[in-house]
Structures are given as C-alpha cells and as structure tokens.
A protein has these predicted regions:
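C-terminal beta-sandwich/jelly-roll accessory domains of carbohydrate-active enzymes
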Residues: 582-652
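An active-site-proximal structural segment forming one wall of the substrate-binding cleft
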Residues: 179, 185-186, 206-226, 281-291, ...
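Extracellular and organelle-lumenal recognition/adhesion modules and their flexible linkers in secreted
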Residues: 23-280, 298-300, 313-328, 371, ...
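Solvent-exposed strand-to-loop "edge" motifs in beta-rich extracellular domains
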Residues: 132-138, 177, 540, 580-582, ...
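Conserved, mostly hydrophobic/aromatic
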Residues: 43, 131, 225, 292, ...
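Active-site groove signature of glycoside hydrolases
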Residues: 192, 232-233, 305, 310, ...
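Catalytic-core region of carbohydrate-active enzymes that cleave or remodel glycosidic bonds
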Residues: 387-388, 394-397, 415-418, 424-541, ...
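Surface beta-strand/loop "capping" patches
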Residues: 123-125, 545-582
C-alpha cells in the first residue's frame, strides 16, 4: 500500500472540499489595490559560510595565487618549492612559487591542493586547468610539469603535462576529465625533468561553470525567480576595519590581478573559526551584475559608508570610521559604480564595463549605502552621499538602514534620520523566533504611508533549542511556515513594503558560520531548504496588485492561527490567494470573491508537514516540497479545508 500517496490524496481532498458550514468566511475584493513591485521578493548574497570562494564561485583551488598571509596555506609541498615575488606576473598579486629539481632522480618536487573541504569531481566532467608559468632562468630551454586529479585513495583519475618554453610569463591551459565521481579529491602538480619553473594563479574550474559560477547553484537562484538581488553584503561591506572593507574597484578587471581581501567572517564565531577564509574577489561586481541579468533580478549593490563593522569596533577606534572631511573617496566609489553600471562606453567606468564584455548598461536603479549601521555616525556620513548622488543621478533610488534590530531606540532613531535625509528605502533586518514572525504578520499594517518605503533586507526565523543555540536542524518546516505567515503581511502591505530578501543565501555543509540558510551545498551538489520553497512560491505567485482579503472586515493575520493574503496578476489575468494554517487543527474556510460571477477552475499548491522539525537535506532533498493539484470554485465561492501546518496557494 502506498501510504504516502494516500495521505497526499487525503490532504488535497481536504484542501478543496466544498462545504456550507465553514468555520471562517473570507471576503476577497477583486478591485485591484496597491501595486506590488517587481522587486518584491528577491535574494541577498553575502560571502559567509563559504558562499563565494568554495561556493558559488566555482574555482576549486584554494589560495590559487599564493597571496594568503601564509603564502602556502591550502598547499602541501614536497621537494624544492620556494615562494618569491621578483618580477611577478601580476602587480597586485605578486607572489608565485618556483619548482626546482629535488636533487635526486627518485625524488619529486611539487604541490598538492585539496581545495575547499576537498575537491568534488564528477565522472565524465571536464575540468579546465589554467596556470601562468615561465622558465625560472634566462638560460632555461624547456620545463615540464605534470598535473593530476587524485581520488581519496591517492590514485590519479586524470592527468596531463604542461610544457613551458619561455622565460616570460605566459598562460597555459589544459583540460582534465574525471573518470569517477569523487567527493574529496585533490589537484597534484609535480615537476618533470631538471629545469626549474615559476608558476602562479593555479586554477581549476568545472567546464560547465557559468561566468565562473557553479552551474547548480546558479540554477538554484534562477529557479527562485527573484525580483531583486542585493550584494555583496552584509557585514563584509563594512569589514572588520576600514582596510578590509569590501571595495568594488578591486573586484573588476582581470580576475588574476584582483587583490586578496580578508573575509569578515573568518574569526567572528569562536566555535566556527576558519583562518583560511579569504576573498579572492574572482566573484566581483561585474559577475554580480551579470548574475542579476541572468536570473532576471534588479541589482542592488551595497557600498561602505565609511564605517567599519560596529559590532567589532568602538566608535572611537582609530580604524573604525573615516572622518567626514575625508569621505569623498567613498562617495566617489558610489558615483563611479553607477557610471560602471549605467554609463556610456565613452566614460571611464563604462568603458571598463565594455572592455570586460558588456557594452550595454546594466540598468542599475538602486544603490545601498551602509549595511546595518546605527547611531549618529551613520546619518552624518550618509547625508553627504545622498547630496551628491541626488545631484548627479537623481533617478537612482538610495537605500539607507535602520540598524540591526527590529525595534527599539536605535531602530526608531534610524527611521527618524532616514526620513530626515529623504532616502527612498530603509533596510530593516530581523532574525527572530518563529513565534515572533507569527505575532508580527501585522507589523506593517500601521506604518506611515509617506516617506521612505521598507526594504526587509535580511530576515529569517531562527529555531532555538533549550540551550538557546541553533538546533541541529539546518532549516526546518516550523521556521519556513512562520515565514510564510509573516510574508502575507509583507504582501498585504505592498504599498509600504517595496521588497524583501531572506538571509543568508548559501552555506557549505562543512564550512558554515551561520544558520539557517536558504541553500546548502557540498562540493558535488546542493539542496533547497523548505524555506527556499516558501520564497519560490511567493516569487512565482507575486501578482501585480494587492487585493483586500478580510474576515469580518479585518485582515487575516493570526486569528485561530490563520494568515492570508490575496493578489491579482494583471499580466496573467490570475487571482491568487495564499493561506497559512499555523495551528494544530484543520480549518474550514469559504472564500467569496466579490465582483466576480464565476471563479472557475484553478490550481492548488501546498507545502505541508506534520513534523515541525522536518528538513530537506542532501540525503533527502525532497522531504518537504510543494504538491500541485486541480481545484474548482462554485460560482464566486471557493470552499476549502486547510489542514494543520500547511501553506496553501490557490491560483485561478
């Protein structure tokens, strides 16, 4: 007996049953209300949890340019290997290694690199190897070195030879093909013969990478259908200090010459320290703009306001902030970024964009200044940005911040200052319990409708155990369901909520610092969390206009654990209702669509689990996923029974 199939059928039957004695009478007005922005549901990327190097950025070699403070971190060496920076290939990444003869015919000189928690190799996949090399001496004639992919049993599964014949730096390429699937392989390089050779920028990418990004992770983003893409952070925008802040100009131009930067998250959490966590910036602003275009999302770059991370610095720390008199280079970075994104090819930064391969503008419409700053230091700096951006680019929307908290003195002060400065959007952040999300579904009902709009730039429900630490579950159904309930309030208040992005986006299963996260991955594959499916269902059923949905003249935002919103999609000519039953009992609901005679046939999509701690994992990727069925209304009424712990989307 197929028990799972029977339960699924019973669930769908319950969700669409016709009845006259419903417990709840919902009224949906078919008169279009507030416009829902195309950017309403989106994604936020930050290089945390090895989200960039070791994650979305498909480079498989760690410390490929030997620029980590420990120059050979990530490498095992054998034989005669030395590091040098004399007459380098790249001025901003000057270090390279010399492989010299080991001095005995039975000895080897070489290097091994295990990548990020091992190298994931797939059977039949081609891997593009790149290296810059030269003969070590002017008198040298020919040097050879072997490259091999090695499995967990230390056996080569692919190999090739590179021959170097010049004493000038040149780029060499080769293709390796794995003959088996390996989760934790490595790259081995060793010198053949007696001639010494210098090598730099040792690189290995899967051949199916898109613009240097992992194909599976790009698809995970594209399938969300996001409307907005905020990048590159987050706290890394600020840096541990100003010297390590994220500087976009270091992330454009040839990837080989982008200087290394420390990652803000390498030492943040004592229980999850990663001293080898750096940013090669191979995934830079140009790539972020390309990715935005690829997945159909508006780009929202965030830049430093001149304040280092306020969690890690006191306001009086010497390297914590730049004084306002010296702020102009930071403002110029913002103005130049807009030119890079939108400027003509005759402009300095527009020409660089064209030289990199994209002469057409990226159509940037928004820019964020500062991450989650608080206190008076922030608005006094932001004011200078606002003045100059407004003067030169009046059409660009400016996003400010209300700080790291969802309420309180600093939050109120932040909003007051953002109104005073006249920013277009205010970035709110809240990482709270599922109960908070359920209780705050009406958060925006009474917000001021004039002035800046809300950007819910970072949010996620955090389930805690008795020790107040995140549970073993990476992401679970309880959290996802509470987020779905909360999002009915975002949707209902689309006149004041302009856009929203869940955070964080990515996490390596062996290299995370923070959880929960939307997408988890190892070196071979990824898994979409239950929360991912909530985000996807909202984004693909966004609609263009809010419809009033009420019970007894009031919004449905928690009475008997029910939450609901309704929208109309003008393009698809579709009516869409979202209902969350967060309670422990089934609810019978009649929905009457005023102004319609016949609603007709439609589709029902449900996300349900009886286990609040249910998760999707790499071992069981589809444990909790949406189910779709047909549904039919009777006249202008839809009568449904929504089981406990269910998120349901009705589309007609």
């Amino acid at each position: 007996m197929n028990t799972k199939k029977i339960l699924s059928t019973l669930l769908l039957t319950a969700l669409t049953s016709v009845g006259v004695n419903a417990q709840h009478q919902f009224t949906v007005s078919t008169k279009p209300g507030a416009t829902i922005q195309p950017t309403m549901y989106g994604i936020f990327f930050e290089d945390i949890n090895f989200g960039a190097d070791g994650g979305l950025y498909a480079e498989m070699v760690e410390n490929r340019s030997f620029e980590f403070p420990d120059r050979l971190m990530g490498w095992n060496t054998f034989g005669d290997v030395t590091v040098s920076d004399v007459k380098p290939a790249f001025d901003r990444n000057p270090h390279y290694v010399t492989l010299a003869n080991a001095g005995h015919r039975e000895k080897r000189t070489g290097l091994e690199n295990r990548g990020f928690f091992g190298m994931g190799l797939k059977k039949g996949m081609h891997y593009d190897f790149t290296v810059y090399a030269r003969l070590h001496t002017l008198q040298g004639k020919e040097a050879k070195f072997r490259i091999e992919l090695i499995d967990e049993e230390d056996r080569p599964i692919s190999k090739a030879t590179v021959t170097v014949t010049s004493n000038k730096w040149q780029k060499y390429t080769s293709t390796l093909t794995s003959d088996k699937t390996v989760e934790k392989g490595l790259l081995r390089i060793f010198l053949e013969g007696s001639e010494s050779v210098d090598i730099d920028h040792v690189s290995l990418f899967p051949a199916d990478s898109w613009q240097g990004m992992r194909a599976d992770l790009v698809k995970d983003l594209a399938d969300l259908h996001p409307g907005i893409f905020r990048f590159p952070g987050g706290c890394i925008v600020e840096g541990t200090d100003l010297a390590t802040r994220y500087q976009w100009k270091n992330t454009v131009g040839p990837a080989e010459n982008r200087p290394l930067n420390e990652n803000r998250w390498n030492y943040t959490f004592p229980h999850r320290m990663y001293p080898n966590y750096y940013q090669t910036l191979g995934l830079g602003f140009y790539e972020f703009f390309l990715l935005s275009e690829k997945i159909g999302a508006e780009p929202l770059p965030v830049l430093s306001c001149g304040l280092a991370c306020q969690y890690q610095n006191d306001d009086n720390d010497k390297n914590a902030h730049v004084c306002t008199a010296d702020l102009q280079p930071y403002i110029d970075d913002a103005l130049d970024l807009i030119e890079f994104a939108n400027g003509p090819v005759t402009s300095k930064w527009g020409r660089l964009r064209a030289d990199m391969g994209h002469p057409a503008p990226f159509n940037l419409k928004q820019i964020g200044i500062g991450n989650e700053q608080w206190g008076p230091l922030y608005p006094e700096r932001l004011a200078l940005f606002v003045k100059q951006i407004r003067a030169k680019y009046p059409h660009i929307k400016i996003c400010g911040s209300s700080g790291p908290s969802a309420s309180g003195k600093e939050f109120d002060y932040g909003w007051e200052q953002m109104r005073r400065l006249g920013v277009d959007l205010v970035d709110e952040h809240y990482y709270m319990t599922p109960d908070w999300f359920l209780k705050n579904a009406g958060r925006y009902d009474n917000y001021n409708r004039t002035g800046p709009k809300v950007f819910a730039g970072e949010y996620a429900a955090h389930v805690h155990g008795l020790d107040k630490q995140p549970t073993v579950a990476m992401n679970n159904f309880e959290a996802a369901l509470s987020e779905a309930a909360f999002m009915t309030g975002l949707e209902r208040n689309a006149d004041v909520v302009y856009q929203a992005t869940y955070a964080p986006l990515f996490a390596h299963v062996e290299g995370w610092q923070w959880r929960p996260d939307l997408i988890w991955f190892n070196n071979l594959e990824s898994v979409r969390s239950v929360n991912w499916y909530v985000q996807m269902l909202y984004a693909t059923n966004r609609g263009t206009h809010v419809l009033s949905l009420t019970e007894g003249g009031k919004p449905v935002e928690g009475h008997e654990n029910l939450y609901a919103s309704a929208v109309y999609d003008k393009t698809a000519k579709a009516y869409i209702v979202k209902i969350v039953n967060a309670g422990d009992k089934e609810q019978h609901i009649n929905l009457t669509f005023t102004g319609l005679k016949n609603l007709g046939k439609g589709k029902l999509i449900t996300l349900h689990s009886n286990d609040p701690r249910a998760t999707n994992s790499l071992e069981n990727k589809t444990h909790v996923v949406p189910q779709t069925s047909d549904v039919e209304a009777h006249g202008n009424m839809l009568s449904v029974k929504v089981p406990a712990k269910t998120f349901a989307v009705y589309r007609f």
